[in-house]
């Protein structure tokens, strides 16, 4: 009987003959922190997400906090949904903002755009929606709300890797910021990790700095261990090459994971 049980919660891991040689190459390359494998993973994600502005980070929660920082929510309020994991809302508090609850659509569990608009306040800095259960929110209505009131729209798409809205992948510039999780129980995992996509190239460039202390890793400057020019302080949110190696291997299996 035990042999016939369906492993409902078994984590997807690529075949060992694919994954282990790739991991071995990374582990013994001399570079296991943020490096070429992270860049490779981001480049591989771009066509999957329909967006060239892709930042790999160390968790979905970090992706959300980075998006909230880029949106400038500190000192204001964020209209969001109570129908979500605590990890959606904790970054709002971490960024010094106040969550304001909007009602949900009882048919989908997603945030109700009409009630979200009613809940806007003078100090509202962003709307934070969740694609509940992987079913996309009404992005047309939410982005319309954002455009009317000058408020950026952030999407927690932890459940929605591979989903589409209006024929475009979730992660495309249909939202100002889209955040994914690569934690252990998501569609694909990098053991832990996250992804942030941005609509605006300027937000992407700023986010690239803020995910690693605020230091420009691409600039020609003195060794950051002895001196660095940091115009704006940042976080330690970057992904490492070991996680990215797993991510690259996992992406090849995403279509079959989505069909399962």
Where on the chain are the PLM-derived regions?
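Generic structural signal for small/hydrophobic residues in well-ordered secondary structure
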Residues: 22-23, 45, 63, 78-79, ...
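Hydrophobic/aromatic ligand-binding patch that stacks against planar heteroaromatic rings
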Residues: 91-92, 145, 187, 242
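Conserved coil-to-alpha-helix start sites within the AMP-binding
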Residues: 83-89
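N-terminal "arm"/small-domain region of PLP-dependent enzymes with the aminotransferase-like
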Residues: 1-31, 36, 229-231
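Aromatic/hydrophobic pocket-lining residues that form π-stacking "cages" and hydrophobic walls in ligand
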Residues: 88, 142, 207
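Phosphate-binding glycine-rich loop
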Residues: 31-77, 90-95, 101-103, 168
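Active-site phosphate-binding strand-loop segment of PLP-dependent enzymes
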Residues: 107-190, 195-203
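Active-site region of PLP-dependent enzymes
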Residues: 160-167, 173-260
């Amino acid at each position: 009987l035990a042999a016939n049980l369906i492993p409902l919660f078994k984590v997807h891991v690529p075949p060992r003959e694919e994954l282990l040689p790739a991991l071995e190459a990374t582990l013994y390359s001399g570079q296991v922190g943020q490096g070429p494998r992270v860049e490779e993973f981001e480049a591989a994600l771009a066509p999957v997400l329909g967006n060239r502005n892709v930042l790999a980070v160390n968790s979905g929660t970090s992706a959300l906090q980075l998006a909230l920082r880029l949106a400038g929510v500190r000192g204001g309020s964020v209209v969001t949904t109570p129908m979500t994991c605590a990890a959606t809302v904790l970054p709002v508090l971490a960024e010094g903002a106040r969550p304001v609850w909007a009602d949900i659509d009882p048919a989908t569990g997603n945030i109700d755009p009409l009630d979200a608009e009613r809940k806007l306040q003078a100090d509202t800095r962003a709307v934070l929606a969740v694609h509940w259960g992987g079913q996309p929110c009404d992005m047309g209505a939410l982005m319309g709300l954002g455009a009317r009131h000058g408020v950026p729209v952030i999407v927690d798409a932890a459940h929605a890797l591979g989903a589409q809205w209006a024929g475009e992948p979730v992660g495309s510039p249909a939202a100002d910021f889209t955040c994914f999780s690569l934690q252990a129980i998501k569609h694909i995992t990098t053991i832990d990790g996250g992804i942030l996509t941005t609509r605006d190239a300027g937000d992407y460039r700023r986010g690239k700095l803020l995910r690693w202390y605020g230091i420009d890793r691409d600039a020609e400057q003195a060794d950051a261990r002895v001196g660095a020019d940091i115009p704006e302080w940042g976080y330690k949110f970057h992904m490492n090459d070991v996680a990215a190696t797993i991510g690259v291997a996992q992406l090849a299996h995403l279509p079959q994971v989505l069909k399962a």
